[in-house]
Structures are given as structure tokens and as C-alpha cells.
Amino acid sequence: MSLLLTLIALLVSLLLFMARRRHGYWQRRGIPHDVPHPIYGNMKDWPKKRHIAMIFRDYYTKYKRSVYPFAGFYFFFTRSAVITDLELVKRVLIKDFNHFENRGIFYNEIDDPLSATLFSIEGQKWRHLRHKLTPTFTSGKMKNMFPIIVKVGEEMEKIFSAKTTTGEGQVLEIVDLVARYTADVIGNCAFGLNCNSLQNPNAEFVTIGKRAIIERRYGGLLDFLIFGFPKLSRRLRLKLNVQDVEDFYTSIVRNTIDYRLRTNEKRHDFMDSLIEMYEKEQAGNTEDGLSFNEILAQAFIFFVAGFETSSTTMGFALYELALDQDIQDQLRAEINNVLSKHNNEFTYEGIKEMKYLEQVVMETLRKYPVLAHLTRMTQTDFSPEDPKYFIAKGTTVVIPALGIHYDPEIYPEPEKFKPERFTDEAIAARPSCTWLPFGEGPRNCIGLRFGLMQACVGLAYLIRGYKFSVSTETQIPMKFVVKSILLSAENGIHLKVEKLSK
């Protein structure tokens, strides 16, 4: 018994020594950092007390005037460098991208094919896949998908019309309604499905989609292992996604491919582009083609990323417009003016002409970047001419987008909603890499133009026909779901919606 206790004591002592050794890295280098918790590192307040984006935002604010271009941080036992210098941000994302190509997050293409997305995969596989998928999001492809978005926008307008009356305000939870719009758009464009979630809030496509975002296969310690030690988790053959979620999307993609190949149907959407690459792979052209599992993963991330980010952005935009009626009126005037030039019809060219609408969306994404921090893994020692910029191989680099977006030296009065920050002149006057809701550089979001187009069309339909204002149920100031990685409103966004007379 005494021997067992001795062994346990030795093991605990060894673990504590290793933890202290890991947590002493930044101190040994003389890099400024907060004192880490013995177990949680600098993550003690997440996910129960503070949103992870707020932790990084405060870190940026605290250390931005340091003589070093980054501050030390510990994600449990993993060392990270939180970048506080814009020049280093630019080098990480663009100039010295070869040192920081990968995100260092979990994927397991063999056991968990849904996880092997363009967002997560690494190295040569990522480069090849990015090259193959880039033509899918050209202006021509966007224009081809535009009628699908407009059709769903019309359906959303009908739902709002049924829920409101002229001259009277009706309090509605906005995020759920616009999420059903984005689900139907992406269901059509990515899978060729009429999801009908606008008519049926409990449509399987949406409920499974929400589960794909929220639910994890294991939870607890294994989740910590997956997010903290992705390479080890891959060797242990762990999986991120719930089995019935994987089965659902696998079945949809398989049935969609089989149907379109059998009927030769062309819808000029995202799935058409993927099927073209699938046919090349089946014909033996692996250089230009995609396997079924590769198509499955990309269709999955297209839905998950577009569904959550666009609907959240639309919800936050309507929230800000409800708080400022002058901005809402100015936006409505622009929408009506442009539509009058296009026979009161929504056209691809007309949406491109709505510059103030674009500025509203961009300012929304400044205040509420859905993914409010970026991560990169240091592939090789980063040893520039100035030794204080040195970042060792294996260090996770964190770019605190929310901190940069709220830096008063970059955006004066950052708490205020000012769409004019995003005129061409204002953008040109700011340093680069100061607006990061879609990342920047070679690994930026490949679908950013689609996401912006989807949000702009949806907002144009709503602002044209409805007045949004705050109610007693509106949460002011905004509170976020602290346990989520993404920025999302706690308990939704409740606004008073009034139908406007035509």
C-alpha cells in the first residue's frame, strides 16, 4: 500500500513538474504574459464566465503597448502567442505565410470524413484542395446562384408578412427566422434541396444542422484532447462529429450526386461544381478531381459555415439598425432607390450597387465577427531579423480579431455603429489586416463573397418591407453565449417588427 502511495505521489509530482515546466516557457524567454493557472493556463474563465473572444480582446488591449509584438498565453498546457502588433499580423497571414500555413486544429479524414474540410486540413492537401475549389466562387458562379438566393428571400418576406401587420409592431425573435432563410439558401446551393425550413421550423435539415454545430461526439475529457492535442487525437482515431449527423449528410450528398448524374440535371450551384470534380476523379484524373469523401466534407463545411455565420451577422445587423433609426432609414432609402432602377426587382447588379448596405454589413462584422479570433500553427522556427519577433516551431499563434476591431487607434469610438467606416476612402486610410471577420491572405475564407451576398440580399428584403425597432424584450447591451467559440447572442435577438405600407 505504501509503495502504491509512493508511486502515486511520484506521478503527481512528475505531472506538476511538467506543468510548471510548460508554464514557465514565456517567463524563461522574458515575454510578457499573465500568470497561468496550474491546469487551465490562461483559460480559467472560459467557458463558464467569459467568452474566449473577450479573453483575447482584453489580452490584446493589455499588452499592445509592450515592447514585444506579442504576449505569451497558455491554452491549458499549450503555449500560444497572442499577436498585438499589426505588422506581425500581416507577416503571419500574408508575408511569411509559409511559416504559418496551418491552423493546427483537429481533423481525421480516415475515421471522420466530415472533419477533413478546407478549413481544417493542412499542407499539400490543403493547397491542392484550395486550388481546386477557388473557381467555384468566381463572380460568374455567384451570379448563377443569385436567383436561388432571391427565391428564398421572397419566401422569407412572406413569412415576415404573415407574422406582422401594417402600423403595429410585433415582437419577433429574429435570429431563428433569418437562420431558416440561410439554411434554405445553402440547402439549395450546396445540396440542391428545397429544405422548406422557412415554412417548417422543425425541418430535419435545420435541426441536424444545428446539432452539427453544437453537439460533439464525446464531450468532457475527450473533447479537451481533440481540441488541445489534435495530432494525438488523430492517432487515437477519435472523431468529432456525431454518427447520425455524419450519416445524414453522407446520405444527402450520395443521393444528390447519384440523382444528378442519372438525370444529367444542372442547377448551376455549388454542388454542380463539386460533381464536375467528382466525375474527373472517377475518370482517373486525381490531379483535378475530388473523391466522394472530399466532396462530402466541403459540402458539409459550406453548410455549417454559411448557415451559422450569415444568419448571426444578419441578426446583429438588424439589432444595430433597430438601435439607430437614422441609419435604418438611410439604408431603406438606398435599397428603394436602387430597386427603382431595376424595375423593382432584385438583380445581381442591383445588389452590387447597394454600397451603403455593404457598409452596414461590414460594420456589423467589425463589431460582431462571428469567429472573433484566428489561429495559426508555427510550422518552422520564425526567426526574422529582430530577435524579439522569434516564434518557435510548434507555437500556436492567436490573432485577436475582436481586439483589433475595437482598437480606438484604428476605429475611433469603436463601440459606436458607423457604417461610414467602410467607404472606399476610409478603408484606404487604414492599415491592412485591420478587418478580419473572414481572415486574410492565402487562407482567408473562400466563401466570403457568397456569405456577403447572402446576407445583403436577405437584409435588403427585410429593410425594404419592414421597420425594426427595440422592445422591452431586446437585450441591451448585447450579451453573448460564453461557452461558444463563435459570437452569438444569448437568448436570441428580440425586436419589434412593423410591416411598412407599400
From Swiss-Prot:
Localization terms from the record: Endoplasmic reticulum membrane; Microsome membrane
Organism: Drosophila melanogaster
Amino acids binding heme: 445
Superkingdom per UniProt: Eukaryota
Protein name per the record: Probable cytochrome P450 6a23
GO MF term list: heme binding; iron ion binding; monooxygenase activity; oxidoreductase activity, acting on paired donors, with incorporation or reduction of molecular oxygen
EC number assigned by the record: 1.14.-.-
Annotated keywords: Endoplasmic reticulum, Heme, Iron, Membrane, Metal-binding, Microsome, Monooxygenase, Oxidoreductase
Gene3D superfamilies reported for this sequence: Cytochrome P450 (1.10.630.10)
Obligatory cofactor(s): heme
